[in-house]
């Protein structure tokens, strides 16, 4: 499993990084592959984001940003974790509540 460290201080930086990483896994064009996201809430407070990339032939890859843990976990279409990004600097999960 590939583990790296990145500084992604804003939510937009985080989205862009996840989109590029998921597309690179299956050699997809980010301009042609939409990224969907959903808010993860724990005890009524936002704590992360769930990302899903839909590719050709019903291909779906996923990423989970665990805001409190400052890391992003990446999963392939079979559910196998293939990478992790640890954030040296990341957005505040509470920003998503606004």
Annotate the PLM regions.
Residues 14, 18, 22, 50-51, ...:
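Generic hydrophobic secondary-structure signal
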Residues 1-49:
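Negatively charged, low-complexity tracts enriched in Asp/Glu with abundant Ser/Thr
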Residues 25-28, 32, 36, 63-65, ...:
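General "foldedness" signal
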Residues 9, 46, 56, 91-93:
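Proline-rich intrinsically disordered, low-complexity coils
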Residues 69-98:
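A short, surface-exposed interaction/processing loop segment used at functional sites
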Residues 35-71:
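Amphipathic, interaction-prone secondary-structure segments
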Residues 5-7, 53, 74-76:
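Surface-exposed beta-strand edges and flanking loops
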């Amino acid at each position: 499993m590939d583990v790296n460290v990145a500084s992604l201080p804003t939510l937009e930086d985080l989205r862009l990084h996840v989109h590029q990483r998921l597309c690179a896994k299956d050699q997809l064009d980010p301009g042609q592959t939409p990224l969907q996201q959903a808010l993860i809430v724990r005890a009524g407070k936002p704590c992360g984001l769930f990302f899903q990339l839909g590719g050709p032939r019903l291909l779906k890859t996923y990423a989970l940003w665990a805001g409190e843990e400052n890391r992003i976990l990446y999963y392939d279409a079979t559910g196998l974790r293939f990478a992790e990004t640890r954030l040296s600097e990341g957005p505040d999960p509470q920003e998503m509540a606004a």
